[in-house]
């Protein structure tokens, strides 16, 4: 299936000639308006920034844009092309570059999330960079955190190319980019539990170990140099694991060969988030410069069959309203995360410059079974016919794809915070 607007790219030549003069005169006031509101250049500057850049006013913010229930809405057709593609963005993980890997249908690119009560604007890369000028944003968590980070990097790269300034570890699990144009850094930290953990391996443990009363210092040790953090975990809690608290075994999840009590993973996820948010409040809450934190809620998978069979996630369009309901494990994981964010907000209410929100993307993600790589996690999987086993990724998201909407909402949360800060001044 192609774009639902497959013919919208074609214009008759005579119509084009008529439109050009009109377009020119129509653009003049728009250009002047943009220069007035957006003083920063659209393209990457070569000026070397050795110290913090002076903070200039961010774009004008409208009060009616700062309050919205983004969870209540629908996916509607959208004529506009994505801000980037596999050839214009070099940070897309190979397994999420669906078009470059031969995915034939393009329709999944032409939808936008429309909240029922308000407007969700298209992502504005310049606005994001202006609001985060002189700051360091970190994405911390599992591969969904990395997926969201790479989406954001690609959209920002459409106006200002970043420089990769740090890399450590296998599979690009720890990286940092620098936007010289705005003295702005973005990092990604691999920490699938947020708390201290030992991951299972092919040569060692056949289960994970989690130490629930200790935050993972692999990322937390850098907290003093971070201004905003986006936390994203969940899927790794489904794996077999043994849990420790106070140096004692608390229990386990799916450990039939061990003499431990089976306690599942919902309460463990809650403890991990609670420990993490408490560490943020304790270490960054008293900071006079302020600190912002967001928790991206659980993103449902869309397996409709065996992961290694053709058709594991075959959909090519979003779900319609009422077609799917957030329930079971997906709903429980989201609820735990939202509840712990609200509890941490109550515990930090006296900290004026500590801001915390849940980036609630569970429902809108549930409604996009068409947005996963599926078999196109590998290049041209059917070039030699359909094999007996076809590996599918029905968890992560194609880039570009529905996950770009997460960062549109992220920007709106930041704009809401900025508006509140201005109003208080």
UniProtKB/Swiss-Prot annotation:
GO terms for molecular function: O-acetyltransferase activity; xylan O-acetyltransferase activity. Xyloglucan acetyltransferase that catalyzes the acetylation of fucosylated Gal residues on xyloglucan side chains. Predominantly catalyze 6-O-monoacetylation of Gal residues in the Fuc-Gal-Xyl trisaccharide side chains of xyloglucan oligomers. A motif (DXXH motif) lies at residues 393-396. It is a single-pass type II membrane protein. It comes from Populus trichocarpa (Western balsam poplar). This is Xyloglucan O-acetyltransferase 2. It is found in: Golgi apparatus membrane. One of its GO terms (biological process) is xylan acetylation. Disulfide bonds join 68-118, 89-154, 98-398, 313-394. Residues 39-425 are lumenal. It is an enzyme of class 2 (transferase). Keywords: Disulfide bond, Glycoprotein, Golgi apparatus, Membrane, Signal-anchor, Transferase, Transmembrane, Transmembrane helix. One of its GO terms (cellular component) is Golgi apparatus. Belongs to the PC-esterase family. TBL subfamily. Its EC number is 2.3.1.-. The chain crosses the membrane at residues 19-38.
